[in-house]
Amino acid sequence: MPELPEVEVTRQGIAPFLVEQTVVDLVIRNGSLRWPVPDIAKQIIGQVIRQVRRRAKYLLIDTDAGTSIVHLGMSGSLRILPHDTPVEKHDHIDLVLANGRILRFNDPRRFGAWLWCELPEEAHPLLAKLGPEPLTNAFNVTQLAAALAGKKKAIKLCLMDNHIVVGVGNIYANEALFAAGIHPEAEAGKIDIERLTVLVAEVKQILAHAIKQGGTTLKDFTNADGKPGYFAQKLHVYSRGGETCTSCGNLLSEIRLGQRTTVFCGICQTR
């Protein structure tokens, strides 16, 4: 599943081709995504795209009439292509621009979404209760400590809770906890401020590095120009259960936590 770095890389890739361009058509070939795609042709045709933003794992394509809210789901991708590019399987939506290009949404598993919002996006049900962005100053040790106070849940589950901090999915939660030396099952409310300070710093550093490297190379992810990301070559624990720890040489443990595969080093990461 594309996580925050992959979505940000996509935003950076498509934004230069969309901003200040006029929409001349919206082609919906298959509107049966995670939620039905609304018929917004009348609202969006003739509109100028003002900016392309990201909130958590959602891409926001702003016009004066409203905002398209796009989620890549498990396997979705967005590509900038010439308008006459042949349609392939799973090419569900084309946003057609006056400059002869299209923004094409492809999603084999159809867990993605393309929605429309005419209200300030902060009021949309999908966005209204989201926590702070991890790469902003709003995500800091004071905020995290307050959010975790009294919580008995495993720290990894809290780190992946979008009400606490957005966009830290399974890959980067595994990696950040390893870098911070914190066991993923550690009780969140009992982690001291010093360790939380390290964790916040590692989350920021790992996400920023992943964005710089172009996102994580996984089976379904390619960035906006069709090229794979490169960060997977640098993963220390994710998907490496049973292999040796890159720090101490111990065999990495693999468990299920919150129905997600979790990999950690029982020596380097403590409760």
UniProtKB/Swiss-Prot annotation:
Binding sites annotated in the UniProt record for DNA: H90, R109, K151
EC nos: 3.2.2.23, 4.2.99.18
- GO aspect biological process, one term: base-excision repair
Instruction: Report quaternary structure and partners.
Output: Monomer.
The catalysed reaction is: Hydrolysis of DNA containing ring-opened 7-methylguanine residues, releasing 2,6-diamino-4-hydroxy-5-(N-methyl)formamidopyrimidine; 2'-deoxyribonucleotide-(2'-deoxyribose 5'-phosphate)-2'-deoxyribonucleotide-DNA = a 3'-end 2'-deoxyribonucleotide-(2,3-dehydro-2,3-deoxyribose 5'-phosphate)-DNA + a 5'-end 5'-phospho-2'-deoxyribonucleoside-DNA + H(+)
| Catalytic-site annotation from UniProt | P2 (schiff-base intermediate with dna), E3 (proton donor), K57 (proton donor), R260 (proton donor)
What is written in the cofactor note of this entry? Binds 1 zinc ion per subunit.
State the name under which the record lists this protein: Formamidopyrimidine-DNA glycosylase
Q: Which InterPro entries does the record associate with it? A: DNA_glyclase/AP_lyase_DNA-bd, DNA_glyclase_Znf_dom_DNA_BS, Formamido-pyr_DNA_Glyclase, FPG_cat, MutM-like_N-ter, Ribosomal_uS13-like_H2TH, Znf_DNA_glyclase/AP_lyase, Znf_FPG/IleRS
Q: Keywords of this protein's UniProt record, alphabetized? A: DNA damage, DNA repair, DNA-binding, Glycosidase, Hydrolase, Lyase, Metal-binding, Multifunctional enzyme, Zinc, Zinc-finger
Q: Which cofactor does it need?
A: Zn(2+)
Work out whether the entry's keyword set contains Metal-binding. Answer: yes
Role noted for this protein: Involved in base excision repair of DNA damaged by oxidation or by mutagenic agents. Acts as a DNA glycosylase that recognizes and removes damaged bases. Has a preference for oxidized purines, such as 7,8-dihydro-8-oxoguanine (8-oxoG). Has AP (apurinic/apyrimidinic) lyase activity and introduces nicks in the DNA strand. Cleaves the DNA backbone by beta-delta elimination to generate a single-strand break at the site of the removed base with both 3'- and 5'-phosphates.
Zinc finger FPG-type: from-to: 236-270
Q: Name one GO molecular function term.
A: 8-oxo-7,8-dihydroguanine DNA N-glycosylase activity
Domain of life, source organism: Bacteria
Query: What HAMAP family does the record point to?
Result: Fapy_DNA_glycosyl
Name the family.
Belongs to the FPG family.
**Organism phylogeny:** Bacteria, Pseudomonadati, Pseudomonadota, Gammaproteobacteria, Alteromonadales
